Amino acid sequence: MEVQCGGAGFIPESSRSSHELGNQDQGIPQLRIVLLGKTGAGKSSTGNSILGEKVFNSGICAKSITKVCEKRVSTWDGKELVVVDTPGIFDTEVPDADTQREITRYVALTSPGPHALLLVVPLGRYTVEEHKATQKILDMFGKQARRFMILLLTRKDDLEDTDIHEYLEKAPKFFQEVMHEFQNRYCLFNNRASGAEKEEQKMQLLTLVQSMVRENGGRCFTNKMYESAECVIQKETLRMQELYREELEREKARIRREYEEQIKDLRDELEREIRRARMEREFKEREAIFTKNQQNARKEVENTSMILELIIKAWEIASFIFNQFMKD
């Protein structure tokens, strides 16, 4: 099966096959969310709050606890909820080899593209340094990505009795400019919340994400680099699926030979039928394993180091530039 690779643009989910979305033959829709922000903004804690369990390492630390892009999956409202936590790869001024690798991993884990890019910013003293980090992220993703972005303000509990609108009115001008960039699409989060408050803020955020997805016509954010990476992932997924298919055929041929060898020496017809029934059961067992392997092939591909090398090679051939990696 040949995989055709197109150009940049917005990808409607309905136009993609199930294995492109990582759910071969299951038909489960995905909602892919990426956490972006400066080191120490609280991305990992936010990811844990969204997923409802501690799956990302988080804590108070001067250095980033998250060292590599990590992907965790849960279910919500009949969808596969995919959350990708990113390290401080967007803090670096000039991407080095490690940064390039993490950018590649980020694209591989979110391909064919995220539905929502959450820029995590803690409430409090929004400094010029923090503003520069925010602008760097916005610049790297380009104007096209704004339609898919939500400003997620953490440390809601620090507001205490202060009204959020009053807080925003008194915020520095450059922070208000960021709010304008996001068309006032923001959500407040308290990562220390528990019980009803925790569930309510999760519902508010995911409802906002769903609303944004509808506004975007059910499309995910993509561009030429995503298209190139998705093409590589699809090709490798199909290659792995074909290897599993060949393995199944070899196994079935071996089982058939063994049982036919046994059956030919049997004179009792009932015993022959029993052996044939056993053979069919073994066939079904192998086919069940094959089906599971087929469904998980894409996830296997995404988790190999080889796929990162293949994507980087494809990007080098296409002359993509890492420090402009998300621009149109």
From Swiss-Prot:
<feature type="binding site">
    <location>
        <begin position="155"/>
        <end position="157"/>
    </location>
    <ligand>
        <name>GTP</name>
    </ligand>
</feature>
<feature type="region of interest" description="G3">
    <location>
        <begin position="85"/>
        <end position="88"/>
    </location>
</feature>
<feature type="domain" description="IQ">
    <location>
        <begin position="233"/>
        <end position="262"/>
    </location>
</feature>
<dbReference type="GO" id="GO:0005525">
    <property type="term" value="F:GTP binding"/>
</dbReference>
<comment type="subunit">
    <text>Interacts (via IQ domain) with calmodulin/CALM1 only in the absence of Ca(2+). Interacts with BAX, but not with other Bcl-2 family members, including BAD, BAK1, BCL2, BCL2L1/Bcl-xL and BCL2L11/BimEL.</text>
</comment>
<dbReference type="InterPro" id="IPR027417">
    <property type="entry name" value="P-loop_NTPase"/>
</dbReference>
<feature type="region of interest" description="G5">
    <location>
        <begin position="190"/>
        <end position="192"/>
    </location>
</feature>
<feature type="region of interest" description="G1">
    <location>
        <begin position="37"/>
        <end position="44"/>
    </location>
</feature>
<keyword id="KW-0342">GTP-binding</keyword>
<feature type="binding site">
    <location>
        <begin position="37"/>
        <end position="45"/>
    </location>
    <ligand>
        <name>GTP</name>
    </ligand>
</feature>
<feature type="domain" description="AIG1-type G">
    <location>
        <begin position="28"/>
        <end position="230"/>
    </location>
</feature>
<protein>
    <recommendedName>
        <fullName>GTPase IMAP family member 4</fullName>
    </recommendedName>
</protein>
<dbReference type="GO" id="GO:0043231">
    <property type="term" value="C:intracellular membrane-bounded organelle"/>
</dbReference>
<feature type="region of interest" description="G2">
    <location>
        <begin position="64"/>
        <end position="68"/>
    </location>
</feature>
<dbReference type="GO" id="GO:0005829">
    <property type="term" value="C:cytosol"/>
</dbReference>
<dbReference type="Pfam" id="PF04548">
    <property type="entry name" value="AIG1"/>
</dbReference>
<keyword id="KW-0547">Nucleotide-binding</keyword>
<keyword id="KW-0597">Phosphoprotein</keyword>
<comment type="function">
    <text>During thymocyte development, may play a role in the regulation of apoptosis.</text>
</comment>
<feature type="binding site">
    <location>
        <position position="191"/>
    </location>
    <ligand>
        <name>GTP</name>
    </ligand>
</feature>
<dbReference type="InterPro" id="IPR006703">
    <property type="entry name" value="G_AIG1"/>
</dbReference>
<feature type="region of interest" description="Disordered">
    <location>
        <begin position="1"/>
        <end position="25"/>
    </location>
</feature>
<keyword id="KW-0963">Cytoplasm</keyword>
<dbReference type="InterPro" id="IPR045058">
    <property type="entry name" value="GIMA/IAN/Toc"/>
</dbReference>
<feature type="binding site">
    <location>
        <position position="58"/>
    </location>
    <ligand>
        <name>GTP</name>
    </ligand>
</feature>
<comment type="similarity">
    <text>Belongs to the TRAFAC class TrmE-Era-EngA-EngB-Septin-like GTPase superfamily. AIG1/Toc34/Toc159-like paraseptin GTPase family. IAN subfamily.</text>
</comment>
<feature type="region of interest" description="G4">
    <location>
        <begin position="154"/>
        <end position="157"/>
    </location>
</feature>
